[in-house]
């Protein structure tokens, strides 16, 4: 596990006293300890998080349920979920960090990215990031998991995805 030189971890430089700030990488549940409604275990390696962060499935609470994606964290792509405002100019720090991650893996010779739940990330990010990756790695494919047929075109034409998939029909057959 070697981080590329000059790349900062997510959260470095964040203001954890702000639920939302355009250049924070995370959404913080300020002044609250992560306290799920189920046991995460105990002992010397018990998990502790302060302040709590929003989960990957948009649970903006320090008290997620076992059905929330408590093992993931919601990245801040510049959307203030408190009022719905979007802050994409200047480009948010998370966008730069994510495109660095995409380029890192592309440099390892992978042939595609399967991007889960893409509709939970602004299409504007994908429309910015995918062309940047394809500048140097034009062969690489981007495959999007998406379920709302009403936004398929947006993710193809504005998000620049090569393929979309909806696995609901796979599970429901």
Go through each PLM region and give its residues:
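Aromatic/hydrophobic pocket-lining residues that form the small-molecule binding cavity
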Residues: 91, 95-98, 126
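Core domains of carbohydrate- and sulfate-ester-processing enzymes
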Residues: 2-81
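A short linear-motif detector with a strong N-terminal bias
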Residues: 53-55, 93, 121-123
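Short low-complexity stretches enriched in small and charged residues
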Residues: 69, 98-101
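Active-site-proximal helices and loops of the catalytic beta/alpha 8
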Residues: 3-17, 21-23, 31, 100-103, ...
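The substrate-binding groove and active-site-proximal loops of carbohydrate-active enzymes
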Residues: 71-94, 110-120
């Amino acid at each position: 596990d070697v981080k590329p030189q000059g790349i900062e971890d997510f959260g470095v430089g964040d203001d954890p006293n702000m639920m939302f700030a355009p250049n924070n990488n995370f959404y913080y549940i300020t002044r609250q300890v992560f306290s799920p409604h189920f046991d995460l275990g105990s002992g010397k390696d018990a998990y502790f998080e302060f302040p709590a962060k929003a989960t990957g499935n948009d649970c903006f609470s320090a008290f997620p349920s076992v059905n929330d994606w408590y093992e993931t964290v919601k990245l801040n792509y510049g959307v203030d979920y408190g009022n719905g405002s979007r802050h994409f100019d200047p480009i948010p720090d998370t966008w730069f960090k994510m495109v660095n991650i995409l380029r890192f893996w592309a440099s390892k010779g992978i042939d595609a990215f399967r991007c889960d739940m893409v509709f939970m990330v602004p299409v504007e990010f994908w429309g910015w990031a995918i062309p940047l990756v394809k500048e140097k790695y034009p062969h690489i494919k981007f495959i999007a998991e998406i379920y709302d047929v009403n936004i398929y075109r947006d993710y193809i034409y504005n998000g620049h995805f090569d393929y979309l998939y909806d696995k609901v029909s796979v599970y429901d057959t």
